[in-house]
Amino acid sequence: MLRTYLTVIPLQGRSDLEQMVYAREGSVPPQATRFPIVQVIRDTLAPGDTAQVLTIRQENADTARSYQLLLEELAGLGIPESSVTQLTLPENQHADTLVRLCRDVADALPQITRVYACITYGTKSIPVVTLAALTCAEATHTELEVGGIYYGEVKRRDGRTESASLNDVTVLYQLSGLVGGVRDSTTAEEVFRQLVWISEHREG
């Protein structure tokens, strides 16, 4: 199976991008990483699978350094740089920039694949663009399935890291897809019942 992993390169400087152990319920024992998507890859990539990584990077010196750090971690998993695609954009929040990014992400996704996306890093607008691109690709691609949406959460107290966890937030993506069916349902409760059923029967 071709598994595609979509992530955003963090804006933090190198000194602020520390390695974390992102705990995840039901996963293989987590290992320290700067990038939650690396833990997702460890959890989902099976023998015989092919991995492709798409990265969204706003162009500046910090993201260029962080991109190299990601390549190093991916190489440790046996994923070469030739399997990684950069989607770059300027450091602005202009509507045309974000619309272009949405199109670029959808175009870069393979026609037949299972996609896993990490929405931890980047400006607040980029997760919105990411989810919109996935919705578009699911509708237009031959056989594209969203396997999971993840968010890496770090809890701190008094400036010190207490814990880090990898949260599966796929249910929120599924909710956005079901909302369009509210008009055809007697009550919104029917939509949420569908959502619960889907989340309980989702493949990994």
Where are the language model's segments positioned?
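Long, low-complexity, Lys/Arg-enriched
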Residues: 1-114, 135-204
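Detector for conserved single-position "signature" residues within domains
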Residues: 117
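Short Gly/Thr/Asp-enriched flexible loops that form oxyanion-binding sites at enzyme active sites
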Residues: 124-139
